[in-house]
């Protein structure tokens, strides 16, 4: 009928309008990220530095804790133990220290008030900020994967599970960082230096990631060390499954909490 056709047309137009707004939000976020050299450099630094560290570690011969004991390991256990070191640095520098997420609100500065007048739910604005942070992180994860495959001569069995875990933890930590910045943003800065160099708060998630990374690296070393007493393939598989599940749980809990409290924290932000 004509009424049904009009309803479908209206629904289609609403979808197109929302899609256009999301695209505009995404482009605005990209421009906001790269409008200042300091913000841009610090935001993408982790994605560039981490894969370089992976390559440097290989050439200087940095050994995993298990290798340092001189214990002979199978190729799977040896690769698993070595990947633990890469996983640690990637969690700390790539996931925990992503300024794209840690300064998602703060870098708005005096333009923050514009967000109050954008005709979309604030939840969509937060989703966009997380998407941009994810984009930066995921580029770094792909580069780490490529670097790791290169230096390990194609150790797919160990590198690919690590890569999948890094995708999960990048999203989880980006959500944590955006939520933390929403709760305590600095939007009254006059120079980016104030929120980048003289602000310890955005660096805190890096220490969360460092703690997780150390714990994971120790567990991986123990699994590799005692491979003769366990089924190493099963041990490696269970480790990565458990690690990824933990990351998913963290991401879900943070995003559910953020969804409930985002508007409250958004409303109380003042630009002086």
Predicted regions and their residues:
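Hydrophobic alpha-helical transmembrane segments of membrane proteins
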Residues: 1-113, 122-272
């Amino acid at each position: 009928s004509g009424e049904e056709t009009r309803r479908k047309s209206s629904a289609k137009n609403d979808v197109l309008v929302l899609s256009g707004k999301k695209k505009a939000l995404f482009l605005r976020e990209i421009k906001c990220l790269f409008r200042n050299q300091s913000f841009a450099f610090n935001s993408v630094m982790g994605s560039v530095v981490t894969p370089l560290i992976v390559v440097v570690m290989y050439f200087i011969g940095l050994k995993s804790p298990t290798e340092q004991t001189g214990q002979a390991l199978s190729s799977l256990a040896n690769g698993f133990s070595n990947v633990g070191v890469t996983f640690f640095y990637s969690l700390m520098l790539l996931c925990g220290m992503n300024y794209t997420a840690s300064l998602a609100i703060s870098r708005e500065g005096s333009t923050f008030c514009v967000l109050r007048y954008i005709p979309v739910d604030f939840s969509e604005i937060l989703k966009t900020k997380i998407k941009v942070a994810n984009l930066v992180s995921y580029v770094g994860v792909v580069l780490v994967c490529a670097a790791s495959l290169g230096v390990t001569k194609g150790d797919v069995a160990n590198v690919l599970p690590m890569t999948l875990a890094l995708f999960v933890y990048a999203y989880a930590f980006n959500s944590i960082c955006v939520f933390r910045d929403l709760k305590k943003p600095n939007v009254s800065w006059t120079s980016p230096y104030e929120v980048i160099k003289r602000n310890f708060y955005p660096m805190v998630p890096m220490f969360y990631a460092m703690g997780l990374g150390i714990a994971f690296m120790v567990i991986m070393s123990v699994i590799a060390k005692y491979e003769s007493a366990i089924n190493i393939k099963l041990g490696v598989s269970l480790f990565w499954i458990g690690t990824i599940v933990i990351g998913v749980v963290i991401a879900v809990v943070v995003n559910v909490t953020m969804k409930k409290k985002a508007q409250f924290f958004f409303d109380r932000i003042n630009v002086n």
